[in-house]
Amino acid sequence: MRARKATVELQYNGAAVKTSLKEFGEAFSYTDPAGGSSDSISLTVGDPRYQWISAWLPHKGDQITAKISFADRDGDDKTTTLDCGLFTLDDLSYSDNGGKAAFKMSGVSAPALDAFSTTERTQNWEKVTLKKVAQTIASRYKLQLVFDATDVAISTQEQSSATDSSFLNQLCNDYGLMLKVFRSKIVIFDREKYKKKDPVATIPREEMSSFSWNTTLAGSYTGGTITYTDPKTKKDVTYTTGGGKRLLKSSTKADNLADAKRKIEAAVTSANHGITTISFQTMGRPDLCAGQTIMVTGVGRLSGKFYIDKKTDSLTSTSYTSKIEASQVPTTSDAVIVDAIQRLAAIGVINSPGYWIGKHKSVKYLDDLLLQMATTILVNHDTGLYTGNPQEALDALVKYGVINTRDYWAANMGKLQYISDLICKAANALPEIIQ
């Protein structure tokens, strides 16, 4: 759905606000992050009769319930309502420039009880699970817990002079889970699981009024190493996942090897999220929300599947727009693999793209190999160092982080004609400095 107009419905401390953006409002925005922070709203209202600094003066801690009603742009008069939730005012400001007075209110979707985010606690959690910890904390503030992830057993975990909000958020981060507080709920979910879901919509470039894209290697990793002290033997234990030169190093508490393995894999995955990002603005999209995936098309090689990290709906008396901030999701869908093959052909790593388009499903993991090659190899340096030498070519690809499973490809190059040639050409494309 693409909305052509929208109106805001507000309840202030339980009472309906009998105003509209057209009468008083200048702007309203609703920000929906996927996790790591709470939903938020911002409302700017004109104050020509100075009511907002007298009888209507809001106070920090007051509560606002916000809903946005949308009319479909197709003109069928169908109305959809988006319940933004309950917000606690935490920031108020007022300005008066030459008689043009305005009052701005901002609020977050967090428990009204300040203790959740301000009161520090010290507690030793023993023989619990992450879900049990979250349920205990949620109950303190009369919040509902929504837990959509594989639970984690925790032998001991110290909460040392930390607020319940920061402690629970850090605990989720340690295990690669996302936390979000909204609509009187604490929601914990597995972002990697959500990234695997089917796209809910396709957004072509023609529907975007603006578009930006960024990618970087800074902060990305091909693996990680964790060192922890075994609680039973008191000896240091080191575990490494992945390979290559860009290893994330961690020294942290772990209950056992399985716990350490999950923590370092979560840390690497979290660090690699957001390596490639996009941001675009479109006509209001009430059907989209953070945590969903979308397909973006019409931007050449930048097209693909993306996970919505944040969505901001902005309304004025005359317009409604949505800003989407999203991270690319590596995928092996046909469209993305065809695009990867064409990119490799464009730089001379592949000579016959039609062959690979027809064969990319014939060998297990070939999709992933082609996608990783296209993502990593952007320029063909054509060193010629590995022509006719696929085994050394595999070593070079491992060093550069193009592949992690050398043994698999060493054993399976003969399953399809020209795989060894592809591996050699890909290695030749790497800059000589890393050889």
Where are these regions (language model features)?
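Assembly/oligomerization scaffold segments
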Residues: 1-112
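Acidic, small/polar-enriched beta strand-loop surface segments
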Residues: 2-9, 15, 169, 178-270, ...
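Short, basic/aromatic beta-hairpin or loop at an interaction surface
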Residues: 32-43, 260-276
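Amphipathic, non-transmembrane alpha-helical segments in extracytoplasmic/periplasmic proteins
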Residues: 41-44, 107, 120-146, 159-182, ...
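Short beta-strand-centered interaction patches in the first periplasmic/extracellular domains
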Residues: 77-80, 100-111, 144-212, 217
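Short beta-strand-centered aromatic/proline hotspots
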Residues: 83-93, 303-314
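Short, solvent-exposed alpha-helical surface patches in non-cytosolic proteins
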Residues: 336-435
